[in-house]
């Protein structure tokens, strides 16, 4: 018979009591009332925060956007096909955040920072809030460094600085994405991290951009965030904020970044869809009242940081699509008022063969020459003036039958200047090449050439300078000034090269 030892039992009980830890898990839970169209109505969740992450029992996540007296409106970050009425929901106590890090360079990811390029997982230990606050006034400094796009029309007349927000606006099929991707390609030697955010695009269009970046060796310093046209509205709405969080990570690491949002019209449409399904009151063009705040809090995150924070920068190039050139619509006017200038792409110019189809007359950079090197300022001011005079005279010449010789010369010069602004896609020019082209145009060296010959002549002249007069590029790159020596090289080279070009053309 087993003897019961009271002291042993009491020791065991005492030991258990000593090692007992009182652990109570308090969960903020709720019940699914209604689900459909990417929106879930939930009863309960009494202490949920606006913007808090919500987790459903089958694993789908959502964001609490509408906090009402009787229920909570949640937008789903996924299809939510397995969510049922009466299902359990819990609040996570966290605001949406994404992993960030150098490992994301060269990868294609979605709005939740999950890779979609089939190249395996991305390991990262750091996280940033998707919707983090913009730097304050004291955290910034004024813009003074140029961000070269490689496009002669932009770098000379609509200069962009590091930390600026410059809108690219135009109708569909006018080359907006081409301007943005060419700018990414031009950063290869500039040590700038690029983030390209595709919102609601066709998968084939995004694949084309990724292929171009890969072929040109630009994907290694670029992160592509893509949410296609068939993605949930919530993910299309979140994609730009994810891109901004990744760019901010590098900015605060004292690096220079460039972010392209392609395009914010589609983000606004996704947000409108979410808001209408959440029964928020519609305003102008059925957009909700806070659609301005949607874009302002995103674009204000672009900044040139102060010297105390390391002088990193985040330059934003948002893209907005217009309908039939109407820039007075709601979203275009909103984004124009938030940004530091706009590059307007015209369908008429595009169809007339001027590509990139930049309408220099109504495009503007509010940072201006502060974002230009001295060498470019020296040659670009005359180019602006002559093109403005040409545009005025061209409009007048449509009604006048006979023009005096001076006016005819001005028209001929203007046509040649407009011709030198033409560029092939994915062929950005260096600053030295741009200065050479502008100098040749404004000083009349191109006046005796046919319009069709100008592009070929400038390419040959550039090749000749690179091989035989490398000193010209050295001067521009090192001094950032168009010195007398640099001008003497051009004065000596252009006439002799033009004579050779014309002789060869006649043979």
Swiss-Prot record:
SUPFAM superfamilies: C-terminal domain of alpha and beta subunits of F1 ATP synthase (SSF47917), N-terminal domain of alpha and beta subunits of F1 ATP synthase (SSF50615), P-loop containing nucleoside triphosphate hydrolases (SSF52540). It is an enzyme of class 7 (translocase). Its main location: plastid. One of its GO terms (cellular component) is plastid membrane. CDD domains: ATP-synt_F1_alpha_C, ATP-synt_F1_alpha_N, F1-ATPase_alpha_CD. Pfam families: ATP-synt_ab (PF00006), ATP-synt_ab_C (PF00306), ATP-synt_ab_N (PF02874). Its EC number is 7.1.2.2. Keywords: ATP synthesis, ATP-binding, CF(1), Hydrogen ion transport, Ion transport, Membrane, Nucleotide-binding, Plastid, Translocase, Transport. It is found in: Plastid membrane. InterPro entries: ATP_synth_asu-like_sf, ATP_synth_asu_C, ATP_synth_asu_C_sf, ATP_synth_F1_a_nt-bd_dom, ATP_synth_F1_asu, ATPase_a/bsu_AS, ATPase_F1/V1/A1_a/bsu_N, ATPase_F1/V1/A1_a/bsu_N_sf. PROSITE patterns: ATPASE_ALPHA_BETA. It catalyses: ATP + H2O + 4 H(+)(in) = ADP + phosphate + 5 H(+)(out). It is a peripheral membrane protein. ATP binds at residues 170-177. The record marks 363 as: Required for activity. One of its GO terms (molecular function) is ATP binding. Belongs to the ATPase alpha/beta chains family. Produces ATP from ADP in the presence of a proton gradient across the membrane. The alpha chain is a regulatory subunit. F-type ATPases have 2 components, CF(1) - the catalytic core - and CF(0) - the membrane proton channel. CF(1) has five subunits: alpha(3), beta(3), gamma(1), delta(1), epsilon(1). CF(0) has four main subunits: a, b, b' and c. PANTHER family: ATP SYNTHASE SUBUNIT ALPHA, MITOCHONDRIAL (PTHR48082:SF2). This is ATP synthase subunit alpha, plastid. It comes from Cuscuta obtusiflora (Peruvian dodder). The lineage of its organism: Eukaryota, Viridiplantae, Streptophyta, Embryophyta, Tracheophyta.
């Amino acid at each position: 018979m087993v003897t019961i030892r009271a002291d042993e039992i009491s020791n065991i009980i005492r030991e258990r009591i000593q090692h007992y830890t009182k652990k109570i898990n308090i969960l903020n839970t709720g019940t699914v009332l209604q689900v459909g169209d990417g929106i879930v109505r939930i009863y309960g969740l009494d202490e949920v925060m606006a913007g808090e992450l919500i987790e459903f029992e089958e694993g789908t996540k959502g964001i609490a956007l509408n906090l009402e007296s009787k229920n909570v409106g949640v937008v789903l970050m996924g299809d939510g096909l397995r969510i049922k009425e009466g299902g359990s929901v819990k609040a996570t106590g966290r605001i949406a955040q994404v992993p960030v890090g150098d490992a994301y360079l060269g990868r294609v990811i979605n709005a939740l920072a999950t890779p979609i390029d089939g190249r395996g997982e991305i390991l990262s230990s750091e996280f940033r809030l998707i919707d983090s606050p913009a730097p304050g006034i004291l955290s910034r400094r004024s813009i003074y460094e140029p961000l070269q796009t490689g496009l002669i029309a932009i770098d000379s007349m609509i200069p962009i600085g590091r930390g600026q927000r410059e809108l690219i606006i135009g109708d569909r099929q006018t080359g907006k994405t081409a301007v943005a991707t060419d700018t990414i390609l031009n950063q290869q030697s500039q040590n700038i991290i690029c983030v390209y955010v595709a919102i609601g695009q066709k998968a084939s269009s995004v694949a084309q951009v990724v292929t171009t970046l890969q072929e040109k060796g630009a994907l290694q310093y670029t992160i592509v965030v893509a949410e296609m046209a068939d993605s949930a509205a919530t993910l299309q709405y979140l994609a730009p904020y994810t891109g901004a969080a990744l760019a901010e990570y590098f900015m605060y690491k004292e690096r220079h970044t460039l972010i392209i949002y392609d395009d914010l019209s589609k983000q606004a449409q996704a947000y409108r869809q979410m808001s209408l399904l959440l029964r928020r009151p519609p305003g102008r063009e059925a957009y909700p009242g806070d659609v301005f705040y949607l874009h302002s809090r995103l674009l204000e995150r672009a900044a040139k940081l102060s010297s105390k924070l390391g002088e990193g920068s985040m330059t934003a190039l948002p893209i907005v699509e217009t309908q039939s050139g109407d820039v007075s619509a709601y979203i275009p006017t909103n984004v124009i008022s938030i940004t530091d200038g706009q590059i307007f792409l015209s369908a008429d110019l595009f169809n007339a063969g001027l590509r990139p189809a930049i309408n220099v007359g109504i495009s503007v950079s509010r940072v201006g020459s502060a974002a230009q090197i001295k060498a470019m300022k020296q040659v670009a001011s005359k180019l602006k003036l002559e093109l403005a005079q040409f545009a005025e005279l061209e409009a007048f010449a449509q009604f006048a039958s006979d023009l005096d010789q001076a006016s005819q010369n001005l028209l001929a010069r203007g046509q040649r200047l407009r011709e030198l602004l033409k560029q092939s896609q994915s062929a950005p020019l260096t600053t030295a090449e741009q200065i050479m082209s502008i100098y040749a145009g404004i000083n009349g060296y191109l006046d005796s050439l046919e319009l069709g010959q100008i592009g070929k002549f400038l390419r040959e002249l550039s090749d000749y300078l690179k091989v035989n007069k490398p000193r010209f590029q050295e001067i521009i790159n090192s001094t950032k000034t168009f010195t007398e020596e640099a001008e003497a090289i051009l004065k000596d080279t252009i006439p002799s090269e033009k004579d050779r070009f014309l002789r060869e053309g006649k043979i």
